[in-house]
């Protein structure tokens, strides 16, 4: 009976009564999941790039460097120093927004040989895990208090009928932005997890 009560306590994520090891365990799961998504994003982007001609790669990369991802509108640390200074809750909140911004667009991430629906379920699981961590680390603070009304459009006209060149550019943009954002989330969650170990060196 005592073991059942303990298990329910862990699942309820009452941070005030939970030892730090419980949060570390949840962080480890979240970091592992986003690492998998980041690797998947890298692979799909590489597969798409390898299907292009050299000149196409050069032109698309040039355009992408001048363009923005939808998620660039989410306020986040500008460099590694600001990342290290950010609170655990802030890093979790930004990570949550980044993952949430891909819920709709991820349905079109079929740039590789893996099943089309592979990414979306993994994103949903990661989003749920981050939300649990946010609740565990809130300590009474209001979640997303700085920009709770922010809503990002799902890559606008990606689903409209486009010419061949424009469709190619949009696919490149989608895959490149997804890879970029999963790298961000992996970095933020890794730093936040490290913060739970006072003696750890969290230098990026």
UniProtKB/Swiss-Prot annotation:
Signal peptide range in chain numbering: 1-17
Keyword terms: Disulfide bond, Hormone, Metal-binding, Pyrrolidone carboxylic acid, Secreted, Signal, Zinc
Pfam families: Hormone_1 (PF00103)
Gene Ontology biological process terms from the UniProt entry: animal organ development; growth hormone receptor signaling pathway; positive regulation of growth; positive regulation of receptor signaling pathway via JAK-STAT; response to nutrient levels
Cross-referenced InterPro entries: 4_helix_cytokine-like_core, Somatotropin, Somatotropin/Prolactin, Somatotropin_CS
Residues engaged in binding Zn(2+): 36, 186
GO molecular function, one term: growth hormone activity
Main location as per UniProt: secreted
Family annotation (PROSITE patterns): SOMATOTROPIN_1 (PS00266), SOMATOTROPIN_2 (PS00338)
Stated family: Belongs to the somatotropin/prolactin family.
Task of the protein: Growth hormone plays an important role in growth control and is involved in the regulation of several anabolic processes. Implicated as an osmoregulatory substance important for seawater adaptation.
Protein name as annotated: Somatotropin
Gene name as annotated: gh
